[in-house]
């Protein structure tokens, strides 16, 4: 076998490189900790908001009314996603295939591909297979597949509010074998419903935390990509 020659920098340069990379690693560690703390803060606030330990007030300073306990079928019409023809699906978004397809997955919010048609305009979807009970507010026309559960509000509701509250529910599978959740099973779960105005205040507050979490997540990814690029340049 032939010899492999390694091009090594001087010890002084090696020390500078190691120090610089350590600083980048420390930055990534700090951002990761910040992301964890923000996520924990959101979780804690959700518990307090949905248990009504913390209440918002109306814009005029008055107190909102009492929340009303309801089963989900009293608030939503619940349907299940089905199949879609292969000819109606594209992996790439185009002017024709412009509607997102969502399936039963907790990755990338269940995104599957693009369709040339939609089934529902706005709804909350809930995973009914695998990792059960993950709710996502869908605020644009979409097509659900693979038995993804779709909650269509009977009257005007804030979808983000119900996304967050459903995600706090302890949803368990009633079937043996592969975990699954059916529309009739989901319909019996109970939630507490405030006025639409209070729903919106809670949803906006939680969305503001989500935005901060997303910014930090992007910063972490950018720092990791930057480090990767630096390493590639250094050792070419």
Question: Language-model segments: which ranges?
Answer:
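A short beta-sheet element
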Residues: 1-2, 103-166, 174-178, 182-186
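Hydrophobic aliphatic residues
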Residues: 49, 76-79, 166, 234
């Amino acid at each position: 076998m032939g010899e492999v020659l390694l091009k090594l920098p001087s010890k002084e340069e090696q020390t500078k490189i190691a120090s610089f990379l350590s600083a980048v690693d420390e930055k990534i560690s700090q951002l990761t900790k910040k992301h964890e703390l923000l996520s924990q803060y959101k979780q804690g606030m959700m518990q307090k908001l949905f248990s009504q330990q913390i209440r918002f007030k109306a814009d005029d300073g008055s107190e909102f009314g009492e929340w009303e306990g309801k089963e989900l079928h009293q608030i939503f019409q619940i349907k299940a996603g089905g199949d879609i023809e292969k000819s109606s699906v594209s992996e790439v978004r185009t002017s024709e295939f412009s509607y997102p397809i969502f399936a039963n997955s907790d990755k990338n919010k269940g995104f599957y591909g693009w369709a040339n048609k939609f089934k529902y305009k706005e709804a909350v979807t809930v995973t009914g297979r695998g990792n059960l009970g993950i709710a996502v507010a869908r605020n644009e026309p979409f097509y659900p597949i693979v038995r993804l559960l779709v909650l269509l509000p009977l009257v005007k509701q804030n979808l983000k509010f119900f996304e967050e509250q459903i995600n706090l529910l302890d949803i368990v599978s009633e079937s043996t074998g592969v975990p699954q959740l059916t529309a009739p099973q989901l319909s019996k779960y109970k939630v507490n419903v405030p006025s639409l105005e209070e729903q919106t205040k809670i949803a906006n507050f939680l969305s503001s935390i989500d935005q901060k979490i997303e910014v930090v997540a992007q910063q972490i990814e950018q720092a990791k990509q930057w480090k990767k690029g630096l390493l590639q340049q250094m050792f070419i």
